Amino acid sequence: MKTVSVIIPAHNAAATIAGTLASLRSEAAVIGEVLLVDDASSDDTAAVAEEAASRLALPLRVIASNCRDAGGARNLALAQADCPWIYMIDADDLHLEGGLRSLLSRSDAQPRAEMVVGAFRRRTKGEHHQFKLPYGYTVTGIANASAYLEGQVRSIAVGSALVSRRAIGETRFPTALAYDEDTLFWARLMCRAPLAVITQPVMTYFVSAERSDDRFTIKPAQRFLAWRHALRQLTDCGIAKSTLKTREGLVALKIARVHYARGDFDTAARFLAVAKAAPKVPSDIWRCMRYQLKLAVRRRFSISHALLQSA
């Protein structure tokens, strides 16, 4: 049965979308529709996708969008999806043969599960990294969402999870956030959707470390405050405020590390102070101490260098 709606947000993805669609060809027997949200592309994304889908016999429908936001683009498709199961993948990632059918098989074997998570692999600069296996999840409940936000379980890559449309309901991705919008979406779902995992690899996703880090350097304070506001709305799911504070600290530490690496020590220090004030596990306490020491050393070196230059 064709039971899956595949959702692909795409912005200027003409160079990669045909490969993404080709990677889904082996799952054609279970795919009822592919909803490609062409989000303000200025290239031939839609035309390339339509040609590839016709050649691959995939049931593609293009949705024109001007969201300029991956979360918003996914939301448009979620509102129009017709199949009982939803699978989302980005327009530069690759599905692995048999992954979608394995996710569906686990949902059949564990009928209460409305969210099935598989393994994934990262690809950076052409290098394939070791598969990341899902671990630490319980069957259902807020415990999953809390552990996810606190970094105690494996993160879910978009493209490694299958979710029932019934479980999603009216849940949508937060929009206009520079980062972590998928984490907030998964957390909401995990609060109520019974979950199952498989160890089979489902997809490979491309990571640009530079592009990922850039998200934290543009208007860092403004973007962090917008993200924190969206994060704190998760209290309406019953998630404890202490868990949300822990997440704040994890993200603040990541931002501090990026600014430290790029030589912006003042911004790094400000975000490190936020990270230090948040509840954390011992390993993160050590990371904060280590970066505090490194900042002190680099600042002292910079002052000494400036004095020598002016002498």
Regions found by a protein language model. Give the residues of each.
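Glycine-rich, basic loop-to-helix element that forms the pyrophosphate-binding segment
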Residues: S65-A81
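Conserved nucleotide-sugar donor-binding catalytic segment
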Residues: V139-K219
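Flexible acidic/His/Gly-enriched loops in nucleotide-sugar-dependent glycosyltransferase catalytic domains
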Residues: L100-A167
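Short, well-formed alpha-helical segments that are part of the catalytic scaffolds
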Residues: A13-S26
